[in-house]
């Protein structure tokens, strides 16, 4: 089992590494050339910039039983299909039960963008979001 991080814009790389170290789980950081993220104790794989290049590389590497950290619903859906556990940076674990609603939200947001309406951006990251992420990842690893 590995933890794979879709690291482009991911605010929990260091938290993930701390928790993974405690459980002795290897971490693979995947990023593009615009976001080269090197961390001691993790393998970093860097890919060319391009639409979804990191996402496709991650999907090609993920195996059943791996854990994936991403905020990309499409990537999460593909990883779930490969029997991985998937969570976002706020501690939400993606499941077959919540994926349909999340994908619908993504579709609606893309429709708004095409219509020239820009959805409100995310607020500043909070300590509570970090705590929720730590709790979810710890629970997943403790249950294995």
Residue ranges and their predicted role:
Residues 2-144:
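Nuclease catalytic cores that cleave nucleic-acid phosphodiester bonds
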């Amino acid at each position: 089992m590995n933890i794979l991080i879709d690291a482009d814009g991911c605010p929990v790389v260091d938290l993930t590494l701390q928790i993974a170290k405690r459980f002795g789980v290897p971490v693979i950081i995947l990023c593009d050339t615009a976001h080269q993220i090197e961390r001691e104790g993790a393998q970093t794989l860097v890919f060319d910039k391009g639409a979804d290049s990191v996402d496709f590389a991650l999907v090609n590497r993920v195996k059943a039983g791996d854990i994936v950290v991403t905020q990309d619903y499409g990537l999460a859906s593909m990883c779930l299909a490969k029997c991985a556990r998937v969570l976002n940076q706020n501690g939400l674990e993606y499941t077959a039960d919540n994926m349909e609603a999340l994908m619908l939200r993504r579709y609606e947001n893309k429709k708004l963008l095409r219509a020239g309406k820009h959805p409100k951006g995310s607020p500043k990251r909070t300590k509570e979001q970090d705590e929720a992420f730590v709790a979810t990842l710890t629970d997943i690893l403790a249950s294995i």
